[in-house]
């Protein structure tokens, strides 16, 4: 049997299988530090996410809202609204290092809109971020720096700037301090101006800055002259519906809308109120042209030599219709319009009847707010019941109330060949076809141009004639109506014009709110003395701007109307008598 020798096992290398105490502790510390670093990174990341998404204690959404907001420009590219770099001042109360009482006093001096107690409370609070002044001026920023308080910060915040100041302020509207559009085209165009697809490109309005300035200047002069509480004016392209000017006085500066006193008197709204579309008025005798168009279109007027009895006031039930300046005679169609006879117009409306009168007004849109991009469009005052007297009185603008833009749209259709096109504040592409609704025939439209021209050459609008510009128009004066009650000493005066009448291109409407008579007007305050001069001034200034050069060799043909004009008949009779006497002497 063989013997087996068992060798002893080799000794274990302890240096390779055991960890020294020093190495073990270092490894443990490294792991702990790594975990702490990861945890801190996570906490910081979560905090940043919170600040970016949920926190509102720092600068608000103003900068985010503006971003690449596009400019608003006029039809010729003149900038009306733009975004510029602005700076707001703010403070972080927990970071204040100076004397808080002294700082509160200094802040109250520098920002006096709030009392010193307010700033004491802010500085003692735990609020992390408080605005001191939004859109601060350079002088205010410099003064804040001199306080030497590092807790006061300058926060970059782009702001909306209106380089033309108060011009077209009711059309443009304004933005609030947080960068949110409040009114006007700023509100209507908000999505387009800020969309990624628009990429900050400007949006062109139909407004012509030159025309707008002329309208505002003329209105301002007349408001001051006649101590009126306000005025409104519109210049409308009769073929495209583009509004070249829309003015409302008083005005406000879109750069500082907060400085506008809030109006409390319903008869005297504040400056942010757009009288051209928000106010609805009884527009008086300007409605006579509309009634005549209806009568011609429906065959009630076929013979312009037909005479109507205006020898005495017209009694209808308990109502008595009279003329302001009675002629006390039988009157032809041109005579009724030239002398603005309520009696003659009421008799024509009586032949039209209730149904056709109401239907024509509805066709013109007088029963609903006017169509336009702006909000706050006034609701017309429509008769609750159409009686015979309603038909007669609405024929000369009494008992129905519409906005100035309603009237401008209607007259555009009367003179442009009979088509009503929607009004717009956006520039249309040159030569673009603008669909519309036929209101009257081209033949009727021609007759309306003749009648409007006669009013200016022979009638109540005679002082509005400008050589070579061939203006036509109609005056209108009415008492203000508040809650169904007429304010006898408060007049609204209107002159609506179109030019040139041989080929109309523009309608101009001027409305004066409560003008007062003056020595120069012999105490009179009706449309011929108040609204008409402003419209005449506007047309004289904008005609050449718009390429309409005075030309006395052109005019609309009135030869078939003049024989029915009383003054022309008298002139012809006087001429014939002179010729007869000359022959007798011979």
Which positions does each model-derived feature cover?
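Second-shell loop/turn segments in exported
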Residues: 59-63, 88-96, 104-107, 126-134, ...
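Hydrophobic alpha-helical transmembrane signal-anchor segments
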Residues: 5-6, 20-55
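Short, basic/aromatic recognition patches
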Residues: 45, 53-64, 211-226
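Conserved, well-ordered alpha-helix/loop/beta-strand core segments that scaffold catalytic motifs
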Residues: 129, 193-231
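Beta-lactam-recognizing serine transpeptidase/beta-lactamase-like catalytic domain environment
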Residues: 2-14, 81, 233, 238-285, ...
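Short beta->alpha transition motifs characteristic of CBS
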Residues: 67, 82-88, 92, 174-178, ...
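Small/polar-residue-rich segments within soluble enzyme cores
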Residues: 91, 95, 102-110, 118-201, ...
